[in-house]
Design a protein with these regions (language model features):
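N-terminal auxiliary segments of SAM/dcSAM-dependent transferases
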Residues: 2-68
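Conserved class I S-adenosyl-L-methionine
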Residues: 47-113
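Class I SAM-dependent methyltransferase SAM/SAH-binding core
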Residues: 120, 126-173
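A conserved beta-strand element that flanks and buttresses the S-adenosyl-L-methionine
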Residues: 185-186
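A short, conserved alpha-helix within the catalytic core of class I
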Residues: 192-203
Length: 310
């Protein structure tokens, strides 16, 4: 692992001071503050010294869960399940996830050089996307804060003989990247409210190279407005769904160079005849954007382009 890690070392930096990391025996060491970050077989823990200060609007439940995940020491466990693991999901849920993996693939892989490109999933969870896209990239950075998610994903990657994935335990509010990444993925994560999601978007923007791209998504409020209005039982609980105008405001306040929207309807197989006919009449399940890095002041407005307006 240590020698293999050298190939991506120039992508990593200290989450505290942003200085480069160097490999020193069985740990990574910051060239500035001198902090050491442990290596465990096939993954590295690169957490900041302190947890992030969450916005006042964050729920007590989320605050507690975040703090618990951040403070939990690593312990290897070959039996745990990640959130969203197929072993604990319904067939219907799995089909929807597989459709999204298929729909996102061209957005993630367009223009890559398979022998050189690196994909970073900044909140990778059970690995649905990283495992599917790994064969098309030289390396994949599978990042998460949860010990359970990382243990599960490492186990599944070994079972599938995927050897080009690096597992990194990070805090996505303070990631160990400084304008070093060419391709970032962040799906099913921008759901905790505007303040939380703005913090995460800034982290993504600060991690992207000027020429890099990120694929992100928001849950669409209009996909099921009756639930959002309380006329049907709510199945999204305290999480946040967005209207298109709200997502554009969030992105305009973040230092991205441009943003292109790709609405996605998860009820139909991507590219199928039913998808081509019905997806224009059904509000999109997710509002997906491909955003580009760029040296732009946060107060400026990102230029938007659209595939469809829904």
């Amino acid at each position: 692992m240590s020698e293999k890690l050298r190939t991506i070392l120039d992508l990593l930096s200290c989450p505290d001071d942003g200085r480069p990391l160097r490999l020193d025996r069985e740990q990574l060491v910051c060239s500035g503050c001198g902090r050491g970050f442990p290596l465990h077989e096939d993954f590295a823990e690169i957490l900041p010294r302190h947890a992030a200060r969450l916005p006042a609007s964050a729920s007590a439940d989320y605050r507690g869960a975040y703090r618990s995940l951040f403070e939990r020491p690593y312990q290897k466990d070959d039996t745990c399940l990640a959130w969203g693991a197929e072993e604990g999901a319904t067939p219907s849920w799995i089909r929807k996830r597989q459709r999204q993996v298929a729909a996102m693939r061209p957005l993630v892989t367009e223009g890559i050089e398979a022998a050189a490109s690196v994909l970073c999933d900044i909140a990778a969870g059970a690995g649905h996307y990283t495992f599917a896209y790994a064969p098309q990239f030289r390396f994949v950075l599978h990042c998460d804060l949860s010990v359970e998610n990382l243990n599960y994903a490492r186990r599944k990657a070994r079972e599938r003989h995927l050897e080009n994935i690096f597992f990194l335990r990070i805090d996505y509010f303070q990631p160990p990247f400084r304008r070093s990444l060419d391709r970032i993925l962040c799906l099913d994560t921008l759901i905790r409210g505007e303040a939380h999601d703005a913090m995460l978007l800034k982290s993504i923007a600060d991690s992207l190279q000027t020429s890099g791209t990120a694929v992100i998504d928001f849950h669409n409020w209009w996909h099921n407005p009756f639930r959002r209005l309380g006329l049907l039982p709510e199945n999204f609980h305290s999480n946040k769904s967005y209207r298109r105008s709200e997502t554009e405001i969030l992105l305009a306040e973040t230092a991205f160079g441009s943003a292109t929207v790709f609405p996605f309807v998860q009820e139909f197989n991507p590219g199928s005849r039913l998808d081509r006919i019905c997806s224009r009449m059904v509000p999109s399940t997710r509002i997906v954007y491909r955003v580009r890095g760029g040296p732009r002041a946060p107060a400026e407005s990102a230029p938007f382009s659209r595939q469809h307006r829904r």
